[in-house]
Amino acid sequence: MPPPVAAREAIGDAKEHGRPGQSGIEKAQRSIERTLAFAAAMLSRLRSKRRRRSLSRTMTVLGWIAVMAICGYVGLTAMIYLTQRSLMYFPERTHVTPAEAGLPEATEVPLTTADGVQIRVWHVPPKADNPVILYFHGNGGALNYRVERFRQLVSAGIGLVGLEYRGYGGLGGSPSEQGLIRDAEAAYAFAVAHYPAQQLVLWGESLGSGVAVALAAEKPVGRVILEAPFTSALAVGERRYWYLPVQLLMKDQFRSDERIQKVTAPLLILHGMHDRVVPYAMGERLFDLANKPKHIVRFLDGGHEDLDNNGALDAVARFLAGDLD
């Protein structure tokens, strides 16, 4: 049935004036869809560019952070390498005589090492044929810091040859592993010029334990005492500076772990269980590596510098008397 006249006229009027029918609406919808799709594509493209720019900026920042971290690490490594001896040795540079320190029995004797450095020892002869302690102190202070210990030894009739290292106690020169060993050799030469080698007892305290082991590995002595000893200064450095290639950087490694098996004299190790400078485990390890006869005394409440307060001198007296054998 044909549409009513009014409807035909309306349709004809629409065609005449260009008003869209159903096909025009579809075209308009497609046009809108294309426009929206184009806008979405442009927006996506814009977001992608922003993401790329943001990612690029992030990568640039991370790159600079990495460069700065590498430069900082290299700089820190170089600084520690160049200043390592000042980090390892803490000398008291003031010269204090034995009398000023409170040990008037001691005579201060100047010595010259094989490499021409002037050093000195404090000398107190023993009573009768008592042992003579050839003493190597730690990396801090000087001989006068140990005067209370020396007084107790001397009052018991024990002799003393206390070594003051180069660079310590107002002396010239700079401390190093080779330098300290040469100092020890000069002190040993002085001691054996006055006493039989078997009368000598090497006592090395902390850093001095490395000196004592190095000397005892090459020279005959009666006994050796190691107080708070390390397996090596290298091991201490690796523990403290775990983030650095210490083995490649460290000059003065004091490898007691490699030298101890050449020591044949009776050995006593003293170590505090609460030592936070040289862990007790290092003393235990060095003891395991050492030859017999050997003894270790563990101080349950002892730290690094307080062993005299925990009975160290009593243990030394028993060792010298042969009561620990």
Regions found by a protein language model. Give the residues of each.
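Post-His helix in hydrolase/transferase enzymes
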Residues: 308-320
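Alpha/beta-hydrolase fold nucleophile elbow
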Residues: 197-206
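An N-terminal hydrophobic leader/cap segment in hydrolases
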Residues: 70-110
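Short alpha-helix in the alpha/beta-hydrolase fold that links the catalytic acid
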Residues: 279-288
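Membrane-embedded segments
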Residues: 118-190
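Hydrolase active-site cap/lid region
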Residues: 210-265, 309
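Catalytic histidine neighborhood in serine/cysteine hydrolases
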Residues: 290-305
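Short beta-strand/loop motif that positions the catalytic acidic residue
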Residues: 263, 269-271, 275
